[in-house]
Amino acid sequence: MPKKTVANLTEADLAGKRVLVRVDFNVPMDKATGAISDDTRIRAALPTIEDLIKKGAKVILCSHMGRPDGQVKENLRLTPVAKRLSELLGQEVIMCPDCIGEGVTAAISQMSNGQVALLENLRFHGEEEANDPDFAKKLAANADLYVNDAFGTAHRAHASTEGVTHYLSPSVAGYLIEKELNYLQAAIETPQRPLAAIIGGSKVSSKIGVIETLLEKCDKLLIGGGMIFTFYKARGLSVGKSLVEEDKLELAKSLEAKAKEKGVEFLLPTDVVLADKFDKDAESQIVKVENIPDGWMGLDIGPESVKVFQEALSNCKSVLWNGPMGVFEFDKFAAGTDAIAHTLADLTATGTTTIIGGGDSVAAVEKVGVAEKMSHISTGGGASLELLEGKVLPGIAALDEA
């Protein structure tokens, strides 16, 4: 069901109103300097924040950072985020002493229309992740309505994503969540065809649900990353010291059989880059998958596989990518992932819809420097996967229907 969004709210709805906005400001911090090392998530929230400012709302932002487990941790305070956000907005952002309590109420009561305040880290209170109703009520007490723009936590029923919606009306989606839903749901429900899905990562177990769902939806399924060795072993091939999930061999067989039955083109790499140890400076060699020697482990897909994958993708109108092709953190084993990133960037330029489905593949396209060239980069890891699996996300379900 489509959800009501910020776009549905007029200046008359918002002027002078206190709007609680759940954002995802869980940004990476440089441990040595305490500075923000990547402000992508802060920038991603700007369209919603700027729209609310323009419409005269009093904007109260709330987010978590890290895993403080209900304790106040000085290194997880949101003060650096408030500073960076004020630079991006070109106006002061009031930093609140907590996320609930008298100090917060006092700070918000002083706000003028168009001002922005940031509450302190929600997870300094254990009640946030427990979705405690009293905590949710206190959080909602300083606001008139609610906007959720934190897609990365939409798959969690927390006080700030689900609990507060019981006390604030309307409760609507922000622009970032709206964009995520538009792209990800369209990708699996009404895609331009052929639709290819590229699934990577080290373990089959973490991607079972998404592979099973995609086998019902896509025309081509390309598998890369460490999980390929479980498929090879299931076929009876020797995989040396490569990562294998022994308890998933039957599942790998059944997924491959299901692809055949559904008429989905199922592609595994034909060659791999091997290493003698898991190390960035390991000895390496490229071999056909039938010739993996004992004592070696596969850490990337090989150049022949890249060509096969590129050929398979060349006529696709929609491509969804989740998970790297190899250990891209080691330059020696990043070629497969880099090549797929460049291939998708080139396809986007010719009109193909390319969606990077959260997690490590986002880091990969950013590392290669082609993030801007993709149609859509999802800000959610687990949330993206669950949405692609067809699961209901509590943070989305709790919002008002359009």
Swiss-Prot record:
Which cellular compartments is it found in? Cytoplasm
* Organism name: Microcystis aeruginosa (strain NIES-843 / IAM M-2473)
Query: Pathway it belongs to?
Result: Carbohydrate degradation; glycolysis; pyruvate from D-glyceraldehyde 3-phosphate: step 2/5
**Catalytic function, reaction form:** (2R)-3-phosphoglycerate + ATP = (2R)-3-phospho-glyceroyl phosphate + ADP
Subunit comment: Monomer.
Q: Which GO terms describe its molecular function?
A: ADP binding; ATP binding; phosphoglycerate kinase activity
GO annotation, biological process: gluconeogenesis; glycolytic process
Binding-site residues for substrate, renumbered to this chain: D24, F25, N26, R41, H64, M65, G66, R67, R123, R156
Q: Which GO terms describe its cellular component?
A: cytosol
Record bears the keyword Transport: no
Quote the CDD domains the UniProt record gives.
Phosphoglycerate_kinase
- What name goes with this protein? Phosphoglycerate kinase
Q: Which residues bind ATP?
A: K207, G298, E329, G358, G359, D360, S361
The family database entries (Gene3D superfamilies) matched by this protein are listed as: Phosphoglycerate kinase, N-terminal domain
Q: Which InterPro entries match?
A: Phosphoglycerate_kinase, Phosphoglycerate_kinase_CS, Phosphoglycerate_kinase_N, Phosphoglycerate_kinase_sf
Q: Which EC number(s) does the record attach to this protein?
A: 2.7.2.3
| This protein's record includes keyword Nucleotide-binding | yes
Query: What is stated as this protein's family in its record?
Result: Belongs to the phosphoglycerate kinase family.
Question: Which keywords, in A-to-Z order, does the entry hold?
Answer: ATP-binding, Cytoplasm, Glycolysis, Kinase, Nucleotide-binding, Transferase
